[in-house]
Every structure is written in C-alpha cells, then in structure tokens.
C-alpha cells in the first residue's frame, strides 16, 4: 500500500504542531554537514512513499532550532519526523543503585524513576 507524502509539507505540519515557524529553523543537514535552508525547502518539495517498504528519505536528516530538533524515524520502512526538545535539567538529585530493573520486564516501557524512586 502506497502512502505518498510531500516532505516539505510534512515538515511544515510537524513544525506547526509544535508551535514552530520555518523562521525558527537554525540549520538543516546531518551531524557531518549542513545545507542551506532554502536548498532544503526546494529539495523537500517532493512526494515520497512514507508507507511500509524501503526507506526513501535520508535517515540522518535533521532540522535544528534553538533547543529543539526534528529527526527522521523509521519502522519497517514507514517514515516520519519526530520532534525532540532539549530536556530541562531537574533540580532534584537522586543517587540510584541501578540502571536496570529487576526481573522480566516483558519488553514494557520502563522508566528510571519506576524502580529507583521511593
């Protein structure tokens, strides 16, 4: 099943969902180099199949703003942007005995505080 998406439009939609504007973007590229933002918009104005199958957009592509970024994610070839923010540093300091929960987690999502905070 094909699921065609325009990369430029999907980028704009994710920005809008997080109250960001295109002017909030500081740079676009990967961890090795950046590309001019205007060039990104031109290249991104293209349809691709975001559904299951092969990956079509560079997996290391990132869009970066002040303390936030968009990164590509993929599962079985299905692709999307994921919005990330630099986390706020907590005031609370806690010495923890382990980073690993005891017993079988059944692949559940386990949080550090779930088995260290009292």
Residue ranges and their predicted role:
Residues 1-118:
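Acidic interaction surfaces
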């Amino acid at each position: 099943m094909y699921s065609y998406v325009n990369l430029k439009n999907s980028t704009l939609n994710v920005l809008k969902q997080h109250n960001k504007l295109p002017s909030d973007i500081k740079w676009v590229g990967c961890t090795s180099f950046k590309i001019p933002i205007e060039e990104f918009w031109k290249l991104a104005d293209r349809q691709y199949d975001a559904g299951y199958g092969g990956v079509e957009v560079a997996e290391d592509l990132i869009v970066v703003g002040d303390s936030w970024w968009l990164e590509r994610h993929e599962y079985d070839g299905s692709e999307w942007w994921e919005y990330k923010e630099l986390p706020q540093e907590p005031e609370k300091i806690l010495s923890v005995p382990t980073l690993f929960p005891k017993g079988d987690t059944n692949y559940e999502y386990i949080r550090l505080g779930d088995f260290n905070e009292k």
